[in-house]
Amino acid sequence: MTMTSNWTPFLVGASLHVLSEEKTKDVNNLLRFISEKGITFLNITPSHFSLLSSAREFLADADIPLPESMRVMLGGEVISTKDLNQWLKFYPGHRFINEYGPTEATVASTYFRIPVNADNQVDLPVVPIGKPVYNTQIYILNRFREHCMPGVPGELYIGGMGVSRGYHNKPEKNAEAFVPNPFNPADPSDRLYRTGDVVRMLDTGDLEFLGREDHQINLRGYRIEAGEIESALREHESVTEAVVVPRKDTAGNLT
């Protein structure tokens, strides 16, 4: 349940279907529910969509019609293009949106419309998290809270109307997570939210998510983004999910 999925339907005169966790666990039944209700917009996590896409592949011979122009909004996790392309085999008119945003910034901070090529396939090596939505500002900053050049990884800070007032009765946590905007010192009420997410700006102006700052591994003096390795592993046809975990050898050194 998110702000975007809860309120958007009412802005366009659509109906909202909210299912219990039990009903969404059975992806075969979920797939048929989407078909029976003629769902035109689906908001779902990438891991849940992966199960849904696999279920459709398993039921390849079944007739499960869906609206031709259905839109699928994914968010909260890294997206597998394999799942998207598997789905497009059955529903070539469907299109996907990658939505990014933490709860502290009212969930929706950036979005990316995922393009398809001439063969109606997604051929991106990694799906970006896109550009900021209206009334939202994004900053990629280094540890000195200075701007990072395009292509250089840094921590993502979010500003704008969607930034919350903070955590209830947690002043220490608020001071760490919500910081004064160093680029607008004239307004002391203007704050940025530190996401802890490491991103970089692509040549297109879109943001690419690289991982969590607290998931960086320092190995023999090199800072390694575990998320980048995980993303590369997931692109292999024999890999469904991947997690990179540092280990220590007998001497206690990371390997």
Where are these regions (language model features)?
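Conserved AMP-binding
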Residues: M1, E22, T103, G160
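Conserved AMP-binding/adenylation subdomain of ANL enzymes
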Residues: T2-T40
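Gly/Ser/Thr-rich phosphate-binding loop
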Residues: W7, L11-L16, I39-N43, S53-L124, ...
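Structural motif
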Residues: E21-E22, T45-S47, G76
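Glycine-/small-residue-rich active-site loops that bind phosphorylated ligands and cofactors
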Residues: K23-D26, I79, T250
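Short hydrophobic/charged patches on amphipathic alpha-helices used for structural packing
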Residues: N28-L31, D61, E230-S231
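AMP-dependent adenylate-forming
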Residues: T45, S50, T81, K89-N98, ...
